[in-house]
Amino acid sequence: MAATAYLLYRLALRVAPRGPAVFGGLAYVCWVAMFDGDGGQTPIFYNVFMVAAAGLAMTVATRDARGNVARGGTAMLLVGCAIQIKYNVIFEGAYFGLAMLWARRSNGAQAIVSTGLLWVVLALLPTALAFSAFAATGHGAAFDYANFVSIFERVADSHARQFKRLITIIGIISPLLFVGYPAIRSRTKTGEALFVLGWLCAAALFFLLFGTYFPHYALPLLLPVAVVAAIGLDRIARPRAVAAAVLGVGAIASVTVSGVNIRSKGDYVTAKRLTAEFNPKDQACPFIFDGNPVLYFLSNSCLPSRFIFPSHLNAVIEAQAIGVDQRLEIRRIMRNRPQLVMTLEPHFVDENPRARATLDAELLAHYRAPTRLPYGKRTALFYRPK
């Protein structure tokens, strides 16, 4: 996150003075927690690749009249690394590529096509290497399903819930959009500023089209929004006062959100207490039906299934998106008599009642009454075989 913020600052320096550029980098740090990024969502790891790619792409698209092929290729390879972490950045990567190709329009159609193909290959190279590694071990079909098919088989949330999440996200990001508005409405934009605004449009378009609107899906938006805010801050009255007020609100909100998360989900002490319930020496792997999968790692336990994220087996939206019936997989796991089964109360709000009923039947037949431990605002239940 620190590296991403620094690269944002360096990128913003190309479109704004030092003070507003510092504001852009700090704004990213302050807003990450508000979008559930303080726990390490995937954008925290791929955003650094994207902001580095953006800097290179901006140079090719705005300063190099003939479009430097090697620099553009490096940008697209960085995009490819980000894509292999998560595919959400495809629209942004496509925008970078098209913007750079536009800079080469005077080179002729043949040069544009050949360069475009090279850049596409570089962007797809990390994914191709990952697929090859899986295919070489006989898991090519599983890679294909998990990466390209399952997302389209998830059950969508209700429109009302999606709309509520969208409004919440807009509210959270609105202070930065307010600061950046002068940059958006300005009639005198440099090539670099236009590039950043185009980047923002590409990121926003994917975010809106993808749907679901969980907070962490807005984390990639923070990159162009922070740079646009830096540009806007340079064009408003009393920029220091505005920057101090916005960053102050952001910092307070960030600390508050992190505190709420700790109270609702627990902290290090909670994790240590829960981990003590696991026995890594037992050959019967534990099964976390509901809870944090990091407990497998912290307890050095074996894994009962390839579906180690609890939502894969307990969430309604994943019921048709994992390639197997949730209930059949739960029964398969329970036939191995896990040394420990962990669930939480109250139940997960989006829990699949049919999956829960399958688990409860197994617990009633083969497991003792549970041990109960506090888990933030919920209670962890640990079942052991009779």
Language-model features, listed with the residues they occupy:
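Membrane-interface alpha helices of multi-pass inner-membrane proteins
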Residues: A33, N68-Y87, G93-L98, L125, ...
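Short periplasmic/luminal acceptor-recognition loop of GT-C membrane glycosyltransferases, typified by
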Residues: A94, S264-A319, G323-P353, G376
